[in-house]
Amino acid sequence: GFSYSSDAIFPTDAEVFNRVISEDKRSTSAIISVSQIISQVSSFQIALGLTEQSGFLSDPYKLKDIRPDNRTQIALTNSYRHFFINANAAWHVNYRYYHDDFGISSHTFDMRWYQNLRQSIQLVPSVRFYSQSAASFFTNIDNFVKPADEYQSSDHRLSAFGAFSGGLSFVANLGSWTATLTAERYVSNDSYSAYKVSQPSTALVRYNRISVGLDYTF
């Protein structure tokens, strides 16, 4: 697969808060995958993705956020599927390794159990663990003394942290319509990271989420 995007950036209140007036950024992605049928009830897939970003990659809404204008990202994803005939259920397991030249490496592991209750109803519990290292230029406090051309960012998404999430979805297939009700709990903390944390972020989040979705297929 291949994709390309080009974005024009026009931050609001740019002149009031001394933000950039306008910038642009570009992203090119390519992915290759291989699937293998293991048996009548199980399969495995491996995928390798590469993304190149260039242009304005900083956050214009932060007071001191200066990032490199190029970023190379690579991701390796492994997916395993198995159907349990007697239980009338499917087990999905995924693992993803990610690395970029900002200095971030991450591991993502998630599992889902698709339990068929009736022909048109599914119950889907899920768990997910995520861990990442910090970007080489991450700082938990903005340093306004640093030169304007020296990289730094206090964005918590660039810090070293880990996160656990668990959820439960109820899926009903109603002919051409599919209704989904999902409840999820998400907790992130620097102590959950599998990597060294030299500067913990103070902006990591935790939340409860309930969502309702309705899809139509034609």
Question: Residue locations for each model-derived region?
Answer:
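Outer-membrane beta-barrel channels and translocator barrels
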Residues: 37-41, 85-87, 118-120, 174-177
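Outer membrane beta-barrel transmembrane domains
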Residues: 47-81, 96-110, 114, 120-217
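Short, surface-exposed connector motifs at secondary-structure boundaries
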Residues: 89-93
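Solenoidal tandem-repeat scaffolds enriched in leucines and small polar residues
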Residues: 2-65
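Membrane-targeting and insertion segments and their boundary/processing signals
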Residues: 16-17, 83, 87, 144
